[in-house]
A protein has these predicted regions:
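N-terminal domain-onset segments
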Residues: 1-52
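Generic structural hydrophobic/aromatic packing signal, biased to beta-strands
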Residues: 26, 30, 74, 99-101, ...
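Generic structural motif recognizing short loop/turn segments at the entrances and edges of beta-strands
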Residues: 35-38, 64, 72, 95-99
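Generic preference for flexible, low-structure residues
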Residues: 42, 46, 76, 82, ...
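Amphipathic, interaction-prone secondary-structure segments
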Residues: 42-78
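Intrinsically disordered, low-complexity regulatory segments enriched in Ser/Thr/Pro
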Residues: 68-94
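Helix-rich interaction surfaces within compact, conserved domain-sized segments
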Residues: 86-125
Length: 125
């Protein structure tokens, strides 16, 4: 069991490193192309309300629920809402980027991170 856990951890770290490299390459290419970062907003759980954040970066999906900030960190832009978030803004924390977005989701749709990032760069052409 310990060997399986170690192998899973090794695989997870390798995937996170590969995804981090894809994100870093995306930021460099977006800057090279002059794709301007924008102020990012977050959505409340359940899709209710939009909340300001202090983040600047690029949305990478049409739902505007995932983004890469100017520092090259991946963010899932879904936050608990509430009065505090409405008044002071939300503070979504960065998370490791997955290599496949939506893997294991109920709708069965999944998209490789590389594809999402390429599409976003294609929007700038």
């Amino acid at each position: 069991v310990a060997a399986h856990a170690a192998a899973d951890e090794h695989r997870r770290r390798a995937e996170q490193a590969e995804a981090a490299e894809l994100v870093a390459d995306f930021v460099a290419e977006a800057r090279r192309r002059g794709l301007p970062p924008e102020r990012l907003t977050a959505t409340g759980h359940g899709g209710r309300g939009r909340y300001r954040t202090r983040l600047r970066g690029w949305y990478v999906d049409r739902a505007r629920s995932r983004a890469v900030d100017v520092a090259g960190r991946f963010h899932l832009l879904v936050v608990p809402g509430g009065l505090r978030a409405r008044l002071f803004g939300a503070d979504p924390q960065p998370s490791p980027a997955p290599l496949v977005i939506g893997a294991g989701g109920r709708d069965g749709e999944s998209v490789p991170l590389r594809t999402l990032l390429r599409r976003r760069l294609g929007d700038a052409d």
